[in-house]
Every structure is written in C-alpha cells, then in structure tokens.
Amino acid sequence: MSISQDDILNAVAEMSVLQVVELIKAFEEKFGVTAAAGSAGPAVAAAVVEEQTEFNVMLLEAGEKKVNVIKAVRELTGLGLKEAKAVVDGAPAMVLEAVAKDAADKAKATLEEAGAKVELK
C-alpha cells in the first residue's frame, strides 16, 4: 500500500507545531539533511554584473572631414597612410581592439574631434 503525497501533506497539516518540529528532526536524522533554507547562489551570481574592462573602438563613418579622420586613425594606430585610408574607407571598421576604458574614451574623443562617428563596444 502506497501513501500519496496529498495524504502526507494532509497529515502534516493536522499536526501541531511541536509535532512538525519533531518530524523535521526525524527527517534530518534519517536522511542526513538539514532543513535550513537553501542559498540563493545562482540568483546572487546573476546579480553580480562584471564591469567591462576592454573596449573596441569602432569607426562608423568618416563624416565630411575624411582627411582629418585618416590622420587621427594614423595617430591612434601607428598605421601608414595607405592602411589608415583603407580603414577609413572601409567604415564601419574596427580602429582599436581590446583597449582599456580610458584609452578607448580618448580614442573616441580624438576621432569625433576629427569629424568621425565612433562607437565603443
């Protein structure tokens, strides 16, 4: 004869608080477990947001002052004239990859000052 889950729940519902406490202790001893509340491990881990430390500087478009943007790309990357022009002509294009936030912000400001539209990713 098998006892259903509903039968067990109804039996527990009819117990006094003292009887439920004794039942919990019996479960702990019999099965080697504790009735302590589980930790919210995954929820806590999801709440921790890592701050991005590396950024990519993406040239979206050169704008009206293409020559100034080419000069800025050369200054930031150390590329030659031909290579820098190819980057600017190929926009949207990656100018710098995996740089620190302050370096990425500085590069973005330099390129925007030259007339380019830039995005940090």
Curated annotation (Swiss-Prot):
One matching Pfam family: Ribosomal_L12
UniProt keywords, alphabetically: Ribonucleoprotein, Ribosomal protein
Entry similarity comment: Belongs to the bacterial ribosomal protein bL12 family.
Name by which UniProt lists this protein: Large ribosomal subunit protein bL12
Signal peptide location: none
Function: Forms part of the ribosomal stalk which helps the ribosome interact with GTP-bound translation factors. Is thus essential for accurate translation.
GO cellular component, one term: cytosolic large ribosomal subunit
Organism: Pseudomonas savastanoi pv. phaseolicola (strain 1448A / Race 6)
An example Gene Ontology molecular-function term: mRNA binding
HAMAP family membership: Ribosomal_bL12
GO biological process, one term: translation
Complexes and interactors: Homodimer. Part of the ribosomal stalk of the 50S ribosomal subunit. Forms a multimeric L10(L12)X complex, where L10 forms an elongated spine to which 2 to 4 L12 dimers bind in a sequential fashion. Binds GTP-bound translation factors.
